[in-house]
From Swiss-Prot:
Organism of provenance: Pseudomonas fluorescens (strain SBW25)
NCBIfam families: PRK00418.1
Gene Ontology BP terms: regulation of DNA-templated transcription
Cofactor note: Binds 1 zinc ion.
Name of the protein described by the UniProt record: DNA gyrase inhibitor YacG
Any matching Pfam family: YacG
Gene Ontology MF terms in the entry: DNA topoisomerase type II (double strand cut, ATP-hydrolyzing) inhibitor activity; zinc ion binding
Amino acid sequence: MSQPLTVDCPTCGAPVEWTAANLNRPFCSDRCKLIDLGAWAAEEHKIPVAPDAEDELFSEDLPPRH
């Protein structure tokens, strides 16, 4: 039988078995999952976008929505 895939917890670096039984994957625990969620909520993590793409999102050149 082969070894289950193991990944590192993104929060603490602990090894985590990637199995259906591990409901916290890729995290090792609920605690690490909540720490990561808090970091996203505090905007410590961001998805990169091109600088001008953000300007287009908030452009005043768009017609008003009614």
